[in-house]
């Protein structure tokens, strides 16, 4: 079987460079395209050199339609506007679209859902094995404990992160809500400030911290009468997300059209 040909979207960014490095380390995949935003000063530069590798001859381009003509998939950790633009082209080309972009709105998610009748999409707020195991455990614990245990999710990221709560925190919140059998949107408490009143029973709280160079720390706290359960994950290098994205792309290659998650990729969907 020939290598899976992949495009890295946002190839000039931190995650894009990590993806380029991960591809160079992984058997069965090859970098065939590097996408960057129109007008970027990085256009035309070599993706390998930008990632701290020897030159690989793949220059950054803003033309996804041309890049995708000879590709099998795209790895997309960009921003919502770029991801939604990429969704349409990936669907037209019939290539695998792995989406790790965070900060997507409900309307963005509706657009992604609409293309999955003919497109293969793997979407997750976090691509690492550890976080998805944490989500599975969160769901199980939430199922087992009653409303007398309050659920709080605390996350910390580097000072440059532009969205909050993080996609991973929301992933964990969805897992907790699923375990409780409730809708997260109607049970979510975010950004408490001032005279907020007592905590509502059944709420799932979020706290977001920003500072330094933290790759990503997440804790799920179940606070009950006179005892607490804490589940936590600390990411030490964004390469864990890059290798997870590659695992997702290879898993999805040849699958039927649909919207999949890392839980599907890792066999945790029924956990």
UniProtKB/Swiss-Prot annotation:
It catalyses: (S)-2,3,4,5-tetrahydrodipicolinate + NAD(+) + H2O = (2S,4S)-4-hydroxy-2,3,4,5-tetrahydrodipicolinate + NADH + H(+); (S)-2,3,4,5-tetrahydrodipicolinate + NADP(+) + H2O = (2S,4S)-4-hydroxy-2,3,4,5-tetrahydrodipicolinate + NADPH + H(+). NAD(+) binds at residues 10-15, 36, 100-102, 124-127. GO terms for biological process: diaminopimelate biosynthetic process; lysine biosynthetic process via diaminopimelate. Its EC number is 1.17.1.8. InterPro entries: DapB_C, DapB_N, DapB_N_CS, DHDPR_bac, NAD(P)-bd_dom_sf. Pathway: Amino-acid biosynthesis; L-lysine biosynthesis via DAP pathway; (S)-tetrahydrodipicolinate from L-aspartate: step 4/4. (S)-2,3,4,5-tetrahydrodipicolinate binds at residues 158, 167-168. Keywords: Amino-acid biosynthesis, Cytoplasm, Diaminopimelate biosynthesis, Lysine biosynthesis, NAD, NADP, Oxidoreductase. The active site is at residues 157, 161. It is found in: Cytoplasm. GO terms for molecular function: 4-hydroxy-tetrahydrodipicolinate reductase; NAD binding; NADP binding; oxidoreductase activity, acting on CH or CH2 groups, NAD or NADP as acceptor. It holds the Pfam family DapB_N. GO terms for cellular component: cytosol. Catalyzes the conversion of 4-hydroxy-tetrahydrodipicolinate (HTPA) to tetrahydrodipicolinate. Belongs to the DapB family. This is 4-hydroxy-tetrahydrodipicolinate reductase. It comes from Rhodopseudomonas palustris (strain HaA2). The gene is dapB.
